[in-house]
UniProtKB/Swiss-Prot annotation:
Changing residue 81 to A: Slight decrease in activity. The record marks 137 as: Important for determining product length. Isopentenyl diphosphate binds at residue 213. This is Ditrans,polycis-undecaprenyl-diphosphate synthase ((2E,6E)-farnesyl-diphosphate specific). InterPro entries: UPP_synth-like, UPP_synth-like_CS, UPP_synth-like_sf.
C-alpha cells in the first residue's frame, strides 16, 4: 500500500467536502468472464482495487471508507464461489492488516460475523484489536452484512432494554435507534459509489445513507482506479446537498 505519512486527520474538511464514502464493489464476476477466467479470479483482481481505494481515501482526507465485501444474500451463490470468497477474506486479513496498522488505518468489520467459521472470526478479532487505536482512516468492511439486518439488530437491542425496564417505548426516536446501528459513532455516509453499471442499493446501509449522494459508474470494480475515485469525488463536490430542503432562496420547490 502506498500511503502517506501517518497522522491524525485534520479537523478541516478537504476541498471535496466528503468525510465518509461507501462503495458497492460490483463487477468482479463480469470482469473475470471478459478475461475468460472463473469468478474467483475476478475477486482476487478486485482485492487490488481495494488497496488502491484505501490508499486514495487515506491520502485525500476521507475519514471513513466503507466497502461492501459480502452481503447476507451472497450465501446463495455457488458453494465453490462462497468458499473462495471466505479464503480470500482470510488471505486479505493476513496479508494487509500489518500494512494498514503501519499506516494508521483502523479496520472494522461490520455485519453478522457469527456465521463465519472460527478461523475467520479469530482473524477478524485480532485484526480489529491490532488497529483499534489508530487515528487515521477508518476502513469498514461490510461482511455478511445487510441493511435490513442492521436495522433489525438495532431494534432488538432497544426491545431488550424495554423488556428489562430500562427504557420506555415512547422514549424511542430516530436518534436513539441511530445509536444502535453499525457505524453510529462515525460521520454519516456522504457518498455511495456503485461500480459495474447497476443502479440499485442492494440492501446496503439502508439507514446510514438516507441523505447520501449516489454515484453510479459502468466501470467494473477491478478496473476502478484513483482517477475513477477522483471523478466520483468531483461529482460529489458539484452537487448541492439539500437534506430534504429546497434550494436557497427557492420558495416554490
Amino acid at each position: 500500500m502506498m500511503l502517506s505519512a501517518t497522522q491524525p486527520l485534520s479537523e478541516k474538511l478537504p476541498a471535496h467536502g466528503c468525510r465518509h464514502v461507501a462503495i458497492i464493489m460490483d463487477g468482479n464476476g463480469r470482469w473475470a468472464k471478459k478475461q475468460g477466467k472463473i469468478r474467483a479470479f475476478g475477486h482476487k483482481a478486485g482485492a487490488k482495487s481495494v488497496r488502491r481505494a484505501v490508499s486514495f481515501a487515506a491520502n485525500n482526507g476521507i475519514e471513513a471508507l466503507t466497502l461492501y465485501a459480502f452481503s447476507s444474500e451472497n450465501w446463495n451463490r455457488p458453494a465453490q464461489e462462497v468458499s473462495a470468497l471466505m479464503e480470500l477474506f482470510v488471505w486479505a486479513l493476513d496479508s494487509e492488516v500489518k500494512s494498514l496498522h503501519r499506516h494508521n488505518v483502523r479496520l472494522r468489520i461490520i455485519g453478522d460475523t457469527s456465521r463465519f467459521n472460527s478461523r475467520l472470526q479469530e482473524r477478524i478479532r485480532k485484526s480489529e484489536a491490532l488497529t483499534a487505536g489508530n487515528t487515521g482512516l477508518t476502513l469498514n468492511i461490510a461482511a455478511n452484512y445487510g441493511g435490513r439486518w442492521d436495522i433489525v439488530q438495532g431494534v432488538r437491542q432497544l426491545a431488550e432494554k424495554v423488556q428489562q425496564g430500562n427504557l420506555q417505548p415512547d422514549q424511542i426516536d430516530e436518534e436513539m435507534l441511530n445509536q444502535h446501528v453499525c457505524m453510529h459513532e462515525l460521520a454519516p455516509v456522504d457518498l455511495v459509489i456503485r461500480t459495474g453499471g447497476e443502479h440499485r442499493i442492494s440492501n446496503f446501509l439502508l439507514w446510514q445513507i438516507a441523505y447520501a449522494e449516489l454515484y453510479f459508474t459502468d466501470v467494473l470494480w477491478p478496473d476502478f482506479d484513483e482517477q475513477d475515485f477522483e471523478g466520483a469525488l468531483n461529482a460529489f463536490a458539484n452537487r448541492e446537498r439539500r437534506f430534504g430542503g429546497t434550494e436557497p432562496g427557492d420558495e416554490t420547490a
